[in-house]
Amino acid sequence: MDYFTLFGLPARYQLDTQALSLRFQDLQRQYHPDKFASGSQAEQLAAVQQSATINQAWQTLRHPLMRAEYLLSLHGFDLASEQHTVRDTAFLMEQLELREELDEIEQAKDEARLESFIKRVKKMFDTRHQLMVEQLDNETWDAAADTVRKLRFLDKLRSSAEQLEEKLLDF
């Protein structure tokens, strides 16, 4: 059973996050291993396994990029383990330049420039994210998979920039 079905939700990117949360709580109560403490060993094991599946489904569906990757996996794109990389050389060059800029900001310990950099990367991420949503809604799976690969780069860059921000603020 796929994670969307487990949660009683349609298999699409845009979800009702409140319904997702409520269903998670219901499933957790229903399959909590403590409820099966007096059951047979097989029942206890099944409850632990079901609870683990519910937790994994929850983590996957509530995180936007993980949810997109999972939805794509249902359509034959295994982005989590694939060896495909982004082949868009202009995008890759831009990423290299952004990484170099982040390194320069770190060397200079320039908080103002870092703040501007983070905003710029967030805007780039948001723009691509919106494109991905449209591609998933339109079921253009190849294009959506390519956009998700690019979003991974931007997500890692944003994370690195935010870590640098924490590091600079700790000084």
Swiss-Prot record:
Residue runs in coiled coils: none
Task: Give start and end of each J domain.
Answer: 2-74
Superkingdom classification of source:
Bacteria
Q: Does the keyword Chaperone apply?
A: yes
Q: Name one Pfam family in it.
A: HSCB_C
Q: Name one GO molecular function term.
A: ATPase activator activity
Q: What does this protein do?
A: Co-chaperone involved in the maturation of iron-sulfur cluster-containing proteins. Seems to help targeting proteins to be folded toward HscA.
Q: What is this protein called?
A: Co-chaperone protein HscB
Q: Which organism is it from?
A: Escherichia coli (strain K12)
From which lineage does this chain's organism come? Bacteria, Pseudomonadati, Pseudomonadota, Gammaproteobacteria, Enterobacterales
Coding gene? hscB
